[in-house]
From Swiss-Prot:
UniProt keyword terms in alphabetical order: NAD, Oxidoreductase, Tricarboxylic acid cycle
Keyword NAD: yes
Name of encoding gene: mdh
EC number: 1.1.1.37
Name assigned to this protein: Malate dehydrogenase
Organism of provenance: Nitrosomonas europaea (strain ATCC 19718 / CIP 103999 / KCTC 2705 / NBRC 14298)
Active site: 187
Length: 327
């Protein structure tokens, strides 16, 4: 059996982690033969809840779970971690936009970036989930200057999965048949779920739907606003679906995307698709051998261009308000 992989998870006492940790320990993320060590971080106020999560993980008797470390110190949680999943953040409540969380959560991710810079493995894969995820990814990255930008990504996989699901329901097709979906931009209501390149069995989804009104007036706003609708229905933000998206994101990043397909990942812009450098932006990427590359050469229509730029403009506004948190 392989040596254990160390996985740090922040916000370990929270809702998303409660849906995530047991799946990681069961092998859903790294496979049925890969042992893991969970290094769990949360704030001291979460104490008894985190103790309860620890007891439940122990009581599952997972064969792959070699050890569990519980701490309130990011230096301990991130020490020699191979994977760091940064879930912990102040949650978004009813009527609250992600931009309202920028200041509070920005401080959290600055501290965690500095800790990662000191103690995480140099080839670690670091996924930022806590909102606003794109800008928090940049804050974390900028406060870990000894690590490569290739180490970091922000999660747009939940948005990507939501888009796949809407198309699958519309066309009464299995989700697994849909390829080449993209969600451009920010993990916020300005994101642009883009069907123009999506395919089912080598047929263009847009040609199968034949309803641009549905695309513009139903599909796009449904995906953009799904998080807020879930909060309205549950009284809490998406948890199980977010945990599932984390599993999907990390599995594809580590083991590679399937042939003739790509995924959406928030990564540092390199100027592709006329998105200026310096922001974490949702791009279509392919993953291979543990790395990722932006898919190049896709045609961007005027309709799409407008929406790509709207998302970029929002990200620059977010950055303007947290510049003091960047190194």
């Amino acid at each position: 059996m392989s040596s254990p992989i160390r996985i740090a998870v922040t916000g370990a006492a929270g809702q998303i982690s409660y849906s995530l940790l047991f799946r990681i320990a069961a092998g859903d993320m790294l496979g049925s033969s890969q042992p893991v060590i969970l290094q769990l971080l949360d704030i001291p106020e979460s104490g008894k809840v985190l103790d309860g999560v620890l007891m439940e993980l122990q009581d599952c008797a997972f064969p792959l779970l070699t050890d569990i470390i519980v701490t309130h110190d990011p230096m301990i949680a991130f020490d020699q971690a191979d994977i760091a999943i940064l879930v912990g953040a102040r949650p978004r409540g009813k009527g609250m936009e992600r931009k309202d969380l920028l200041q509070t959560n920005g401080e959290i991710f600055r501290e965690q970036g500095r800790a990662l810079n000191q103690v995480v493995k140099r080839d670690a894969k670091i996924l930022v989930v806590g909102n606003p995820a794109n800008t928090n990814t940049l804050i974390t990255m900028k406060n870990a200057p000894d690590l490569s930008p290739e180490n970091f990504s922000g999660m747009l996989r939940l948005d990507h999965n939501r888009a796949l699901s809407q198309v699958a329901m519309k066309l009464n097709q299995p989700v697994s048949h849909i390829r080449k979906m993209i969600v451009w931009g920010n993990h916020s209501s300005t994101q642009f779920p883009d069907l123009s390149h999506a395919e089912i069995d080598h047929q263009k989804v847009i040609d199968l739907i034949k309803d641009q009104t549905w695309v513009e007036n139903s599909f796009i706003p449904t995906v953009q606003n799904r998080g807020a609708v879930v909060i309205e229905a549950r009284g809490l933000s998406s948890a199980a679906s977010a945990a599932n998206a984390i599993i999907d994101h990390m599995r594809d990043w580590i083991f590679g995307t399937r042939d003739d397909d790509w995924i959406t990942m928030g990564i540092l812009s390199d100027g592709s698709y006329k998105i200026p450098k310096g922001v974490i932006y949702g791009f279509p990427v392919v993953c291979k051998n543990g790395g990722r590359k932006i898919v190049q050469g896709l045609e961007i229509s005027p309709f799409s261009r407008t929406r790509l730029d709207i998302a970029y403009d929002e990200l620059t506004q977010e950055l303007d308000s947290i510049k003091h948190l960047l190194l």
